């Protein structure tokens, strides 16, 4: 009898656990897309489509790197990695058109990044695997001197660590 009750509890609660898992995954995915869109918007909203994609690639490259957090929001909000996250200004997008574009790029990139990278073996990454970038008009970071420039896209220079 006890085994039967245990079995019934498992049968009744298993679908609820599965649904909760899907809901949590969906919420996590939405949060990551939002964080990616924020990063694209605040780091590159005045850049071309290619420039915005490049910022998205660096963000996603960090997600798959062992040296950074394993979620987009973790990467974006890692302490002092992106200037907009600690500049004291509002983190709410104000330019509606630029925000819509950043969201569209983020949704596309988040949904397709792993497939693009697997199929093309990284050839679709316009940043050539960069984990870092900076805008020379705004900064000349000392850490960049230790790295190799792999691309300049719009107003950003993209770098990889020297091996």
Regions found by a protein language model. Give the residues of each.
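Bacterial N-terminal signal peptides
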Residues: 6-15
